[in-house]
Amino acid sequence: MQKLSIIVKDLVVRTQENIVLDGISFSLKQNENLAILGNSESGKTTLAKAITGKIHFTGSIVTNFEDTTVKHARIEFVEQRYSFKNLSGTNDFYYQQRFNSFDANDAPTIFEELLKVYENDSKKNHHYLPGGQATASKADNINSTLEILGIDHLKNSPLIQLSSGEHKRFQLVKALVNPPKLLILDTPYTGLDILSVKKLNNILGDISEKGTQI
């Protein structure tokens, strides 16, 4: 019998005014992928945040992943909005936030932010590389993944200056540099053109075959 990788039981999420999720239960077998459809404000993002431990909930969420060497890399959540620290570490920013020239100079570039993530995950044994390459330098790995989603020309651009579509691609690259056991995507196709959607689908199919659930 195939093992279950995720078990959600009687999940309830409340705000001060509303019950956002009320008694949600489901399970996901290992090697299964899941797409959740629904209108805006129907609770899809709330469910993702509950699974990744970003919000308080009642009920239970159990995850069971095998062959994982780094616990924090088990689950990766690509959100609609990505916040980040400036280089001096004093402020939080997000894409398309109002900024002045000082903010741009103090914001990390795409490459700097990806290199930081890569280094944090460097203890893992496997890194995703387009074309199935076995090894590569940190820079080559990052550049290859940037290129496949069409933003390699922006690698030295400050994050705060990216458009919505560019920022979505950056977030996807960030998750794909070192694929987790579970990848949760919130509206992944927003801001992508048709060619980029096809490329992303190919990447997701590739990492799914290699053990990442989506």
Language-model segments: residues:
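Conserved ABC ATPase "signature" region
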Residues: E112-E119, S137-L154
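Hydrophobic anchor residue at the start of the ABC signature
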Residues: L172
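A short, flexible loop at the N-terminus of ABC-type nucleotide-binding domains that lies
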Residues: Q2-E32, E41, H56-T58
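Conserved ABC ATPase signature
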Residues: Y128-G131, P158-L162
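Catalytic Walker B motif of ABC-type/P-loop ATPase nucleotide-binding domains
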Residues: L183-T187
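ABC ATPase nucleotide-binding domain signature region
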Residues: A48-H127
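ABC ATPase nucleotide-binding domain "signature motif"
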Residues: L162-R169
